[in-house]
């Protein structure tokens, strides 16, 4: 038996079905138990929700393997799952991260920004005023310390994010935007804000994007 904790059970089943066509599953898909993490964990983040992941690990304590799957990112990094991982450590279970692309590091590597000192700050505020204040704070930190600041945004807010960036940041600040990473349609652009203001096109409203700024 295999148990998988997921962000969305429906898409997880579809993914496993597709994978099984070339890599047979250890157990038939019909026999696999897929449990969704609670919605409030998605919204608040595992570290703030007070969610106890131990009940999801009962089968692991009995010797069964458990997989943690998220929608479009790396589980427990900008996606739900850290509470389950933490609970596994607390219970003495072995945690094994699997090799795979992580958009944050791919975007950083392709940005031309400082890859020795960087910080991922999650999502920025949705309110325009609060977002502008946060952007200026991150820009100041980047220029003072040389630390690259990275964040992500929901695709349908990409246009608002780019508009806010161009309104809030100094012309000499470098802004990198990477969208659709690992896809044939991937776009990675890294220019000063002044160059972006000349009419460079940002990501569309349907594609996940990673944003990064630095000196």
What is the predicted function of each stretch?
Residues 33, 64-65, 143-215:
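A contiguous loop/helix-start segment that scaffolds small-molecule binding in enzyme catalytic cores
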Residues 4-96:
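Class I S-adenosyl-L-methionine
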């Amino acid at each position: 038996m295999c148990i998988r904790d997921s962000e969305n059970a429906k898409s997880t089943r579809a993914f496993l079905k597709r994978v099984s066509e070339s890599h047979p599953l250890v157990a038939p898909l019909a026999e696999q138990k897929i449990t969704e993490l609670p919605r409030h964990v998605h919204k608040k983040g595992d570290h703030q929700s007070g969610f106890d992941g131990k009940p999801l690990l009962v089968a692991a304590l009995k010797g069964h393997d458990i997989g943690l799957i998220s929608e479009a990112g790396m589980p427990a990094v900008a996606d739900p799952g850290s509470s389950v991982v933490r609970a596994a450590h607390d219970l003495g279970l072995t945690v094994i991260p699997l090799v795979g692309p992580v958009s944050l590091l791919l975007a950083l590597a392709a940005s031309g920004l400082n890859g020795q000192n960087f910080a991922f700050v999650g999502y920025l505020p949705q309110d325009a005023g609060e977002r502008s204040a946060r952007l200026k704070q991150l820009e100041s930190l980047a220029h003072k310390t040389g630390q690259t600041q990275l964040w992500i945004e929901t695709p349908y807010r990409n246009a608002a994010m780019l508009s806010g960036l161009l309104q809030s940041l100094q012309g000499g600040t470098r802004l990198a935007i990477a969208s659709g990473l690992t896809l044939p349609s991937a776009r990675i652009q890294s220019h000063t804000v002044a160059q972006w203001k000349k009419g460079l096109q940002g990501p569309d409203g349907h594609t996940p994007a990673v944003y990064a700024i630095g000196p």
